[in-house]
Amino acid sequence: VGCRETFSKDIFHEVSLEVYHRFQIINGITEGQQLADKIPFQYNIDLLKGISFTKGCYLGQELISRSYHTGIVRKRVFPFNLEDQDSMLAVDTILKGSSGKILGKVIHSQGPVGLALLDYLTFTD
């Protein structure tokens, strides 16, 4: 994501799909059709160098540019790792803070690690 390198093929080894997905989760990388109608900033596409602010026109450019220049992003995906390594949170589980305020929800989960879409402003208060 975001870079290209050339390596000799003998340094690579095949890994399972589970290992690949865990790598993505730990690094906050999302994928899938469910992202098609979402704001790229919410899914860290800007942090993964998936948005160019110097190239031509694209659908939603005004919204993306405005969000970038104002620095206002209300929600973002964050990776999480549960302390209890034997537990798991189901997708769409609502996450609440200690005050009971809703912070966001789980969007992907694999064992004790997962991704949550959190209300950035509530989460950082």
Language model features with spans:
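A short, charged helix-loop
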Residues: 31-36
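Acidic, low-complexity central loop/insert segments
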Residues: 1-30
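The conserved catalytic core of RNA pseudouridine synthases
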Residues: 1-5, 37-55
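Structural motif
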Residues: 61-62
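Glycine-rich, small/acidic residue-mixed loop/short-helix segments
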Residues: 13, 23, 43, 48-51, ...
